[in-house]
Amino acid sequence: MAGHSKFKNIMHRKGAQDKKRSALFSKLSREITVAARMGLPDPAMNARLRQAVITARKEGLPKDNIERSINKAAGGDGANYEEIRYEGFGPGGVALIIEALTDNRNRTATNVRTIVSKNGGNLGAGGSVSHGFDRLGLISYGLAAGDAEKVFEAALEAGADDVSSSEDGHEIWTAQDALHEVAKALEPVLGEPDGAKLAWRPQTQVTVGEDDAAKLLKLIDALDDDDDVQTVWGNYDVPEEVMAKLG
């Protein structure tokens, strides 16, 4: 976890990739199926599905799995998933937004509440923390896309609102309703992104010390282990020296 970029501090990684590959594939497949059901089951005609497929390919999801997930939606097979959001607080007073795709609201609510409470946090009512975040589009690129100047100029030309570059890559922020339009405009210049999705960006961040950081990351890992949880967003900032100690 060392070397977190600003965004990786906001959105905790999906566990150790080598240990959680099958779980990650399951989440990616679920997002593809949901995206296909929400529009046409054709990536060329469905912007959310196209980005889900691009992200899945970047993460190494086999082509057969991608096609099977799309066909499942087209054929009306499998569970009907709905998007659910939970809000609350973790150790150190960190605000958390937990996004899930579930076919059973009661199961997911019980699991999420149990995980949060067992790890030093508590869930609040809807809207209890989201007022402290901005709902924006986020497009992520690796360093191979180009240097900071090239990415900034491309993002500006494409209509992005903000760009952040670091040793970990580039984060391009857009208005919520401009995400897919900007992502499409960037591809001829920067290539396919590592990811493009709606995100929750905190208006302010909470610096977390070593003790609270260890508890917080344990909580986020536990949430990530739940099959229904897709993404965990937070307003925490863990200093590099603390991250190094925690490994």
From Swiss-Prot:
This entry's Gene Ontology molecular function terms read: DNA binding
The question of whether Acetylation is a record keyword is answered with: no
GO CC entries: cytosol
Tell me where it mainly resides.
cytoplasm
Sequence ranges of Basic residues compositional bias: 1-14
Q: According to the UniProt record, which cysteines are disulfide-bonded? A: none
Give UniProt keywords alphabetically: Cytoplasm, DNA-binding, Transcription, Transcription regulation
Could you give a single Gene Ontology term from the biological process aspect? regulation of DNA-templated transcription
List the subcellular locations.
Answer: Cytoplasm
User: Is Coiled coil tagged as a keyword?
Assistant: no
Span list, region Disordered: 1-21
Report the NCBIfam families cross-referenced here: PRK00110.1 (NF001030), PRK12378.1 (NF009044), YebC/PmpR family DNA-binding transcriptional regulator (TIGR01033)
Q: Which family does it belong to?
A: Belongs to the TACO1 family.
Its protein name is Probable transcriptional regulatory protein Swit_2142
Organism equals Rhizorhabdus wittichii (strain DSM 6014 / CCUG 31198 / JCM 15750 / NBRC 105917 / EY 4224 / RW1) (Sphingomonas wittichii)
